[in-house]
């Protein structure tokens, strides 16, 4: 009824994990998990940077297109 908040439940789970993987393998698994999480976070941050750079490029293209359109209007008025 208390769910998984009871310390005895966590102790049983820890015992099962130790029996399945062995005491030597657990630190290696934790290290691998930590590296995986770090890599995931780094890639998420990298995706944010790529999105920002893409947005800047699109804004620059729009500004360049508007400038070119203004220049051709000026040339048309001169002719």
Swiss-Prot record:
Subcellular location, record wording: Cell inner membrane
Pfam families found in the cross-reference section: TatA_B_E
Region (Disordered): 49-79
Annotated GO biological process: protein transport by the Tat complex
Signal peptide: none
Record keywords, A-Z: Cell inner membrane, Cell membrane, Membrane, Protein transport, Translocation, Transmembrane, Transmembrane helix, Transport
Stretches that traverse the bilayer: 1-21
Predominant place of localization: membrane
Membrane topology: Single-pass membrane protein
Comp. bias (Basic and acidic residues): 49-61
InterPro entries: TatA/B/E (IPR003369), TatA/E (IPR006312)
GO molecular function: protein transmembrane transporter activity
Gene Ontology cellular component annotations, sorted alphabetically: TAT protein transport complex
Function as written in the Swiss-Prot or TrEMBL entry: Part of the twin-arginine translocation (Tat) system that transports large folded proteins containing a characteristic twin-arginine motif in their signal peptide across membranes. TatA could form the protein-conducting channel of the Tat system.
Entry similarity comment: Belongs to the TatA/E family.
Assembly behavior: The Tat system comprises two distinct complexes: a TatABC complex, containing multiple copies of TatA, TatB and TatC subunits, and a separate TatA complex, containing only TatA subunits. Substrates initially bind to the TatABC complex, which probably triggers association of the separate TatA complex to form the active translocon.
Protein name according to UniProt: Sec-independent protein translocase protein TatA
Lineage: Bacteria, Pseudomonadati, Campylobacterota, Epsilonproteobacteria, Campylobacterales
